[in-house]
């Protein structure tokens, strides 16, 4: 069966033949290309990225404080993906950041994480690691967590920092290009070519047909929805996964000081007493700033960053509180569910992020400009719009978030203060779980799927490790 035929422009067929075509230039794609060039430099490797090269990824909002609506968004797309401007935390435990241990086994996942970490160090990552030499302090945090019915997930963290992470990925881009990797920027894959049940290549929005012996989908969180549609179109087996929906919490550094100094990122999990829903902390940014990310069609969601440089630090800590929602039949579009909640918030706030004080959140009233101005805690996201999260979230999620904040207050008092700021909506679009084997082959021969866009990983480190692993599987077949 031929699902797509060659395209033609001005009477001339535009074709290219490569050994490996990688869709997406995020951490998974980068580390896949890196490993291929290290071990098999004779291979012809092509990366296709819908965003810009890293040196051209500039967000005007950093200067103007107002989103310019760039398409594609430089925060989420381009070389290094969303990782380029993230806070750059590398989770060094297989227990955090994805499902590689389930697919490869715990020991193999541990080995790959260590190997990918060594590559980050080679390109300039900070050698210091949080959470490895504070046994007494961590025991005290664990004791408080147990008392609050919270589970502390212990995970060593290497913090790159937003600006240092950018430099590391810049070096990786230069390295790949110097090794002969071809990268097509500002290019979208529009079709996947299937002939007789085998993936043969892709077609781009520039009218080019690229044939490859191996194709890797490494589209990241930004491309998860696109890949879901392609899976349905060409018959790749998938299953509905989890969607995480919640808020970004901002407090003074003093409130989180003990956790920040000893763990940097305290990963805490709670099962709420009312609904028994799983709520977790995620992506803590000490002395960081709350930020806006933009996805397809200008959908604004909240995120957070933290910088290494002292001159860029703030006096506030922010972190995400995410409620995990697992759906059963007949519902099978969790990504759309998360998007609808974010769209509702965007509609209420004119395409910007909503902010509410925890005091108003608990009292069921909207935060006004006046109350926000006299709030003791000053927001780091300056264009956030005061509002009411109860007009956005279902009642169940509101209850889950409130109960989690009350539990966290027992571990680090001050979290449940009236002045605490809640920004919405934070959504993680890693819910399209593609069924893959240990070589990350999909049900379509010749097409492999890795990283956040395939529902395999949820963070920089496991995505990077996933890239190394799939490269080694590819080399066995070429």
Q: Which positions does each model-derived feature cover?
A:
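N-terminal leader/propeptide and maturation segments of large enzyme subunits in energy/redox metabolism
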Residues: 124-136, 140, 367
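Dinucleotide-binding Rossmann-like beta1-alpha1 core, especially the glycine-rich loop
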Residues: 78-131
């Amino acid at each position: 069966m031929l699902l797509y035929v060659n395209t033609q422009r001005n009477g001339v067929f535009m074709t290219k033949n490569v050994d490996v075509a990688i869709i997406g230039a995020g951490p998974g794609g980068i580390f896949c290309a890196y490993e291929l060039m290290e071990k098999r430099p004779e291979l012809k490797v092509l990366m296709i990225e819908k965003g810009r090269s890293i040196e051209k990824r500039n967000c005007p909002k950093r200067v103007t404080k107002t989103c310019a609506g760039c398409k594609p968004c430089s925060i989420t797309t381009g070389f290094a993906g969303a990782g380029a401007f993230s806070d750059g935390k590398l989770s060094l435990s297989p227990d955090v950041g994805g499902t590689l241990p389930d697919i490869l086994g715990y020991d193999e996942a541990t080995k790959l994480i260590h190997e990918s970490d060594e590559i980050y160090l080679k390109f300039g990552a900070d050698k210091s690691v949080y959470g490895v030499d504070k046994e007494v302090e961590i025991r005290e945090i664990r004791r408080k967590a147990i008392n609050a019915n919270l589970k502390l997930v212990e995970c060593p963290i290497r913090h790159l920092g937003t600006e240092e992470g950018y430099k590391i990925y810049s070096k990786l881009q230069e390295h790949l290009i110097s090794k002969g990797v071809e990268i097509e920027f500002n290019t979208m894959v529009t079709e996947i070519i299937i002939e007789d049940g085998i993936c043969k290549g892709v077609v781009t929005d520039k009218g080019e047909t690229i044939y490859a012996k191996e194709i890797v989908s490494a589209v990241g969180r930004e491309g998860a929805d696109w890949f879901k549609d392609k899976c349905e179109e060409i018959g790749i087996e998938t299953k509905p996964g989890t969607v995480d929906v919640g808020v970004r919490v901002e407090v003074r550094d003093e409130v989180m000081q003990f956790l920040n100094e000893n763990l940097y990122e305290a990963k805490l999990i709670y099962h709420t007493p009312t609904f028994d829903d799983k709520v977790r902390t995620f992506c803590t940014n000490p002395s960081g700033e709350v930020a806006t990310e933009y996805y397809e069609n200008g959908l604004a969601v909240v995120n957070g960053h933290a910088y290494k440089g002292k001159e860029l630090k703030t006096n506030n800590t922010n972190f995400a509180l995410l409620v995990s929602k697992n759906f059963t039949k007949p519902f099978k579009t969790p990504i759309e569910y998360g998007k609808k909640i974010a769209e509702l918030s965007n509609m209420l706030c004119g395409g910007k992020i909503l902010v509410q004080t925890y005091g108003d959140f608990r009292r069921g009233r909207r935060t006004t400009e006046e109350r926000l101005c006299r709030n003791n805690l000053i927001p780091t996201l300056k264009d956030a719009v005061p509002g009411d999260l109860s007009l956005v979230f279902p009642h169940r999620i509101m209850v889950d978030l409130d109960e989690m904040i009350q539990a966290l207050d027992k571990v680090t008092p001050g979290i449940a203060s009236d002045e605490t700021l809640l920004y919405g909506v934070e959504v993680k679009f890693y819910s399209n779980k593609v069924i893959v084997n240990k070589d990350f082959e999909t049900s379509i021969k010749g097409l492999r799927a890795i990283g956040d866009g395939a529902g395999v990983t949820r963070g920089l480190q496991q995505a990077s490790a996933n890239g190394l692993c799939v490269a080694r599987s590819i080399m066995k077949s070429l």
